[in-house]
Amino acid sequence: MARGDLETVPGTEGLFYYDTGMYDADEYGSVYVVDAEKPAVIDTGIGTNREGLFDAIEEALSGREPAYVLPTHAHLDHSGGAGYLARRYPDATVLAHERAVPHLVDPERLVEGTKAAVGEQWKYYVEPAPVPDDRIDGLEDGDTIDLGDRTIDVHEAPGHAPHQVVFHDRTADVVFTGDSAGIYVPDADEIKVTSPPPQFHAKQCIDDVKLIQNLEPELLCFGHFGPREYDADLLDEYKRTLVEWVEAVKQKRRELGDDEAVIEHFVKHARIVDVWGKEKSRAETRLNTRGAIAYLEYVGEDA
């Protein structure tokens, strides 16, 4: 799949996914469109290439407009397009975790935090448009979203960020993971770690994966990237990956005694994901190392 493509999620009806071309990379950023009685858009991209997203939504919905915009969390690679979608579709309601709502209404702090986290990758972003406060409502764990012919259950998944939820479409038996189950690379059929600063919490991330395993859906729809049949073994492997990643960063900190040297070590030895390219692969590693260091600072040697 290439940036700008819209495809049907295999094995489903009325469920589509779009490659946003995030960071000028193929198969990195997904947006999902649910063609229900009350249509929904799940995740929104970073706001770049939004005209292509509008076209994809209109194609998927045969010209109808979404009733809901559902970011899985406030990080701008998932919510950065929410304000633009609210402008485009004036009857749509944005629903996000209650802790995400203030950031979407006034994104100033979110922008500052994103710039600090992503560094040079900010060149791929646009300033997010605020979501009007009368167009957005907060979600809590256990809420349901009525799409008419579908019901979506809301589950908190705060390991990646405290404002994250996963959505479970009970009708299609699909879980939209956000970043709670890592970054899926279709070309390699593997899940890579995601551990961004400042609020990554490895132990809670493992609990979030267990939550998804307890749901046992037919399909997982990853924010990064695309759908995959549910496989408990694959998620078990991701839990191990989280543990091994944090341990590797911990050991390298002990060895080098300098966090910048630790970051540069992992960037230098980053495994390049072909479909992302060298720049994005290394930037991802830099971000993840900084997040793991922040987590270790928070929990100390008990990680």
Regions from the PLM with identified roles:
Residues 252-303:
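C-terminal regulatory/interaction regions
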Residues 231-240:
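Histidine/acidic-residue-rich catalytic or RNA/ligand-binding cores of hydrolases
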